[in-house]
């Protein structure tokens, strides 16, 4: 018995247990905010590794892990503010180079500065004109995925009259790969162009677009229409006869008729001509235009 008359049990004193209610056990009244956030119902957040390069151009520069057996990357969907334009039909006019979204991130685009370009939903990598398109290929990527360019050329078909395969040479020994690509381009009726840097590849794309509306006269040989120029062009087709010799012959004989009628000795007496040139000229003047079968 203690001083207050409470009976104490015999033996060692026992410890009392206290239960402290937690926020999970007690239902808070409406409108009350808990002091601590409960960790019982937090959702599990799964961490995923950062995505690797998703475009073909980024892959060509960095290369994904997995070697040659890695799956070929597919370009990501464009953002809302970067939605590509609708695909222009072959033959439609455009002032810009239309770039496929799969080329997003390609360093070549940084060097396309002299002509405008924009993303568009197109089948080739670059649409350079009404009837001109280009596919871009890195040799490093081609060595890992040799079937890639076969599928691209097959899907492209004959939609464009001029199909360019723009190859960036970024490997040490490109001879064998270029030999195979050259054979492929012959069979696919495709033009093969080699670039050794992204800057050079960008200049090729710019040039194709800038010269889209230019006539072919810039690439053709300019022929003079006056008589002396035409005779000079004709005489210089004879081996070792140059423009100076042609002018000397015209000055000496006065006309093309008298020049053709001259003997071999008369031709050899012209200054700077000599017997060898005279013999060649004489043989050309007196041989038939068509060989008569014997």
Curated annotation (Swiss-Prot):
Q: Which GO terms describe its cellular component?
A: chromosome, telomeric region; ERCC4-ERCC1 complex; nucleotide-excision repair complex; nucleotide-excision repair factor 1 complex
Q: Which CDD domains match?
A: ERCC1_C-like
Q: Where is this region: Disordered?
A: 1-99
Specify whether Amino-acid biosynthesis is a keyword of the entry: no
Q: Provide the record's note on post-translational modification.
A: Ubiquitinated with both 'Lys-48' and 'Lys-63' linkages. Deubiquitinated by USP45.
Q: Which residues bind DNA?
A: 130-152
Q: Which domain of life is it from?
A: Eukaryota
What residue spans carry the Polar residues bias annotation? 38-47
Q: Where in the cell is it found?
A: Nucleus
The text of the family note is: Belongs to the ERCC1/RAD10/SWI10 family.
Name of the protein described by the UniProt record: DNA excision repair protein ERCC-1
């Amino acid at each position: 018995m203690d001083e207050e008359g409470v009976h104490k049990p015999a033996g060692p004193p026992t410890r009392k247990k206290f239960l402290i209610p937690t926020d999970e056990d007690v239902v808070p009244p409406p409108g009350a905010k808990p002091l601590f956030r409960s960790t019982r119902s937090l959702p599990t957040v799964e961490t995923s590794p950062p995505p690797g390069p998703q475009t073909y151009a980024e892959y060509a520069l960095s290369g994904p892990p997995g070697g040659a057996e890695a799956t070929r990357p597919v370009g990501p969907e464009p953002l809302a503010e970067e939605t590509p334009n609708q695909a222009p039909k072959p033959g439609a006019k455009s002032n810009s180079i239309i770039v496929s979204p799969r080329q997003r991130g390609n360093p070549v685009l940084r060097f396309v500065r002299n002509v405008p370009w924009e993303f568009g939903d197109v089948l080739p990598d670059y649409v350079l004109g009404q009837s001109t398109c280009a596919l871009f290929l890195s040799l490093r990527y081609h060595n890992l995925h040799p079937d890639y360019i076969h599928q691209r050329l097959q899907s492209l078909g004959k939609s464009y009259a001029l199909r360019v395969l723009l190859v960036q040479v970024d490997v040490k020994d490109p001879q064998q790969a270029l030999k195979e690509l050259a054979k492929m381009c012959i069979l696919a009726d495709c033009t093969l162009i080699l670039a050794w840097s992204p800057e050079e590849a960008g200049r090729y794309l710019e040039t194709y677009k800038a010269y889209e509306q230019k006539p072919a006269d810039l690439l053709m040989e300019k022929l003079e229409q006056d008589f002396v120029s035409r005779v000079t062009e004709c005489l210089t087709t004879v081996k070792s006869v140059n423009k100076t010799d042609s002018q000397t012959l015209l000055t000496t004989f006065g006309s093309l008729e008298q020049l053709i009628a001259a003997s071999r000795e008369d031709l050899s007496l012209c200054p700077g001509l000599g017997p060898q040139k005279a013999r060649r000229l004489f043989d050309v003047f007196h041989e038939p235009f068509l060989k008569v079968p014997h």
